[in-house]
C-alpha cells in the first residue's frame, strides 16, 4: 500500500533530519586523547621506578596510557646536550603537558613558555630562575623540588660514621650536570667544617671512570661520595665495582647503587617525587593551571645500607644508624 505524505509533514521531517545530522556527526567524532611529553636526560632502564610512580599517580586520577591519555617518552640516554632537541620536538607537536625530569627544567623553560610544564628540580628552582616563587610559580611551570644539593653534607656525615679516619673525601660527579657546581660548593663547605679535604673528579663519559678512581687513589682518598646524576645510573655497576676494587667506603645518592652492591645510599625518594609530578599532570589535564599549583618541596629521603658490602670492606655500621635505615640489604 502506498503511503501518502503531505508537503508540510515532509518538510518537517526533512528539517528534523537536517538538524539532527550535525548533532549525530559531532557525537560520533572521537574525543582527542591528550598527549603528555616526558623528557629526561637519563634512560628508560635507569628511571623505571620513577616512571612507574608517575604512571601510578595518573592511574589514581583516572588516566591510563594508551587509553585516555598518551605518554611520549624522550630519553637523552645520558647526553644532556640532546635535551633541548627532544624538548623542541615535543613543542612542535603541541603536546598537552611536558614533564621535564632529571634537571631539564631550565632547558624546558627556554624551549617554550606556553605549554604547561611540570618539572623536578634537585636545587632551588627560584635560584635557578625556573619560577619566581615556590608558592606562586606563575606562568606555565610548576613541579617538585627536592633540593638534592643540601643532601651532600648529610651524605658526608653518614660516610664518616663508618669511615671516621678518612681525611680526604672523594667526590665523583658528571661535569655536564646542571647542578654539579652547586653540589661541589655544598660539599666543600661541609668538608672544610669537618676538617676534611674534598677531592673532586669530573666524569664526562664511561671511559673516564677508571682513570678517575686511579686519580682518587693516588690522592689518598679514604672515602667517596658519588653524585646522584641521572647518567650515573647507567654506569652504576662499574662505579660500584671500582669502589670495591679500591676498597673505598662510598655513599651514593640513589637506592639503585646500594642494590647493585654499593655500601650505602642516601638521597631523595625520587619515586615519591615523580608520583607528585603525576598528580600535578593529572590536575592540569583536568583544567587547572600550573600558575595556581605551588611547587612541592619534597622532604622524603631514603637511606639504604648494604651489610654484605660493609662486611667485605671490614666496616661496621653503628646500631643507631642501622635503626634509621629505610632498607637494609643482607
Question: What residue ranges belong to the model's regions?
Answer:
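Short hydrophobic alpha-helices and adjacent helix-cap/hinge residues
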Residues: 1-330
Amino acid at each position: 500500500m502506498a503511503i501518502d505524505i503531505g508537503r508540510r509533514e515532509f518538510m518537517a521531517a526533512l528539517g528534523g533530519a537536517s538538524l539532527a545530522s550535525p548533532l549525530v556527526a559531532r557525537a560520533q567524532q572521537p574525543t582527542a586523547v591528550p598527549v603528555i611529553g616526558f623528557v629526561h636526560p637519563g634512560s628508560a632502564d635507569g628511571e623505571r621506578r620513577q616512571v612507574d610512580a608517575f604512571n601510578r599517580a595518573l592511574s589514581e586520577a583516572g588516566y591510563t596510557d594508551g587509553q585516555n591519555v598518551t605518554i611520549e617518552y624522550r630519553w637523552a640516554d645520558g647526553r644532556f646536550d640532546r635535551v633541548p632537541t627532544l624538548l623542541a620536538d615535543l613543542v612542535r607537536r603541541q603536546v598537552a603537558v611536558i614533564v621535564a625530569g632529571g634537571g631539564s627544567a631550565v632547558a624546558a623553560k627556554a624551549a617554550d613558555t606556553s605549554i604547561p610544564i611540570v618539572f623536578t628540580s634537585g636545587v632551588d628552582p627560584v635560584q635557578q630562575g625556573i619560577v619566581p616563587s615556590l608558592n606562586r610559580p606563575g606562568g606555565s611551570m610548576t613541579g617538585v623540588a627536592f633540593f638534592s644539593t643540601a643532601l651532600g653534607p648529610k651524605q658526608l656525615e653518614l660516610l664518616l660514621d663508618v669511615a671516621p679516619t678518612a681525611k680526604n673525601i672523594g667526590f665523583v660527579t658528571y661535569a655536564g650536570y646542571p647542578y654539579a657546581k652547586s653540589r661541589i660548593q655544598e660539599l666543600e663547605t661541609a668538608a672544610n667544617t669537618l676538617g676534611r679535604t674534598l677531592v673532586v673528579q669530573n666524569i664526562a663519559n664511561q671511559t673516564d671512570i677508571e682513570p678517575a678512581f686511579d686519580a682518587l687513589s693516588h690522592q689518598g682518598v679514604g672515602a667517596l661520595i658519588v653524585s646522584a646524576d641521572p647518567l650515573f645510573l647507567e654506569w652504576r655497576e662499574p662505579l660500584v665495582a671500582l669502589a670495591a676494587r679500591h676498597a673505598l667506603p662510598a655513599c651514593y645518592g640513589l637506592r639503585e647503587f646500594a642494590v647493585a652492591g654499593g655500601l650505602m645510599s642516601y638521597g631523595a625518594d625520587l619515586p615519591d617525587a615523580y608520583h607528585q609530578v603525576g598528580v600535578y599532570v593529572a590536575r592540569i589535564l583536568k583544567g587547572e593551571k600550573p600558575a595556581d599549583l605551588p611547587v612541592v618541596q619534597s622532604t622524603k629521603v631514603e637511606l639504604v645500607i648494604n651489610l654484605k658490602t660493609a662486611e667485605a670492606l671490614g666496616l661496621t655500621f653503628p646500631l643507631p644508624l642501622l635503626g634509621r635505615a629505610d632498607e637494609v640489604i643482607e
